[in-house]
């Protein structure tokens, strides 16, 4: 694992840190990315080393290069790291799955790739013709936007106006068209607007992250196996946010199949605890409630404070949902019955995406008031 963190480009290599001269990259002939140095196989398409020949002006295989064919080849295989300081009082170990290290810094990079690829394989969409439409709170939109940009799709996203400014800027940077909706209506309002755009736009296709089976499927095929292999099957408990239902359902189902005794714990906001009979909302179609053994509610204030402490104590700059997942994992790790167990927790997104949000409000205000020393 250290080799991936310290040398991410050479970690794509077959099994050495330096490719041998005159050696054809073995990744080229495989059906998925293989990381022999960490004994890992992940179900993304194979890497093909290509370049344009100056003489023939046609794609030519180049020997010995460890270069991804395109940005989608960089999705997945995110590292895990133990939490060491914030876990005071815990009797179980907690290892965080750092989805913040995806190409666009969130777990939604996986489903952006999966949903677009799945629709292409089924002949439902094609670049340059289809207009992709999707409601999003931000991160799924970004996961779709960078892939849409790399493949030549026009993308229209609807998003509650309450989402952070950073997300809007990033989406526009990738060329996505952004339509803001009434924040009081939450994601329901964004979904309604997306359906309206779909009905009024020729050749439009809505990806439906909340109901698209390609969402949990990618987690079943990649996230689950990655956690299982990185923990050598020693994982006892998985803690993950509920969100669209994809991460916890797909990952949880895979882990349960490997070991039915693994506990799957979902995390949802106290302010919108639809699974616990709280305020109105909607339960996503992708959520497999049978996979979950327990649901823990975390308030927004608790999530924000925990995210701050992860930066200060662990050096991990994460988003609010990661703070919620971390606190839930810490609560579970303090239970006497979990002594000596291994808890894996998914950190879904990077903190830099929340600079304009309440997460960094006090720091932002402090920085805005700073004056130069003369």
From Swiss-Prot:
State where pyridoxal 5'-phosphate binds: 139, 243-247, 321
Q: Which domain of life is it from?
A: Eukaryota
Q: For this UniProt entry, what is the primary localization, expressed as one broad class?
A: plastid
The GO terms this record gives for MF are: cysteine synthase activity
Q: Which cofactor does it need?
A: pyridoxal 5'-phosphate
Q: In which pathway does it act?
A: Amino-acid biosynthesis; L-cysteine biosynthesis; L-cysteine from L-serine: step 2/2
Q: Which reaction does it catalyse?
A: O-acetyl-L-serine + hydrogen sulfide = L-cysteine + acetate
Which residue interval is the transit peptide? 1-50
Query: Does the keyword field hold Transit peptide?
Result: yes
* Descriptive protein name: Cysteine synthase, chloroplastic/chromoplastic
């Amino acid at each position: 694992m250290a080799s991936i963190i310290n040398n991410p480009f050479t970690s794509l290599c077959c099994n050495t840190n330096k490719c041998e001269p005159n050696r054809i990259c073995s990744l080229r002939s495989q059906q998925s990315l293989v990381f022999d140095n960490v004994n890992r196989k992940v179900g993304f398409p194979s890497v093909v080393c290509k370049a344009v020949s100056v003489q023939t002006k046609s794609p030519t295989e180049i020997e010995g290069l460890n270069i991804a064919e395109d940005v989608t080849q960089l999705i997945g295989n995110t590292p895990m790291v133990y939490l060491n300081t914030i876990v005071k009082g815990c009797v179980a170990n907690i290892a965080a799955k750092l989805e913040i290290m995806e190409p666009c810094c969130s777990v939604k990079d996986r489903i952006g790739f999966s949903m677009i690829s799945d629709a292409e394989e089924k002949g439902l969409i094609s670049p340059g013709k289809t207009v992709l439409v999707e409601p999003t709170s931000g991160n799924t939109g970004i996961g779709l936007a960078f892939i849409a940009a790399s493949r030549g799709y026009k993308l229209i996203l609807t998003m509650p106006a309450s989402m952070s400014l950073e997300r809007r800027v990033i989406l526009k940077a990738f060329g996505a068209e952004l339509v803001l909706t009434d924040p009081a209506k939450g994601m329901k309002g964004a979904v309604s607007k997306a359906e309206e755009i779909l009905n009024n736009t020729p050749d439009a296709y809505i990806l439906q992250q909340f109901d698209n089976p390609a969402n949990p499927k990618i987690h079943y095929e990649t996230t689950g196996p990655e956690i299982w292999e990185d923990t050598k099957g020693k994982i006892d408990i998985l803690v993950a946010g509920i969100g669209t239902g994809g991460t916890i359902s797909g990952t949880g189902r895979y882990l349960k199949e490997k070991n039915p005794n693994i506990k799957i714990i979902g995390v949802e906001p106290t302010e919108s605890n639809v699974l616990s009979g709280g305020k109105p909302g909607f339960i996503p179609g992708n959520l497999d409630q049978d996979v979950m053994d327990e649901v823990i509610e975390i308030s927004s204030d608790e999530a924000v404070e925990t995210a701050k402490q992860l930066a200060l104590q662990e050096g991990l700059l994460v988003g609010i949902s990661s703070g919620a997942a971390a606190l839930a994992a810490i609560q579970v790790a303090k239970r006497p019955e979990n002594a000596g167990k291994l808890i894996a927790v998914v950190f879904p997104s990077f903190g830099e995406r929340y600079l304009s949000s309440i997460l960094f409000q006090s720091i932002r205000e402090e920085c805005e008031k700073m004056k130069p020393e003369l």
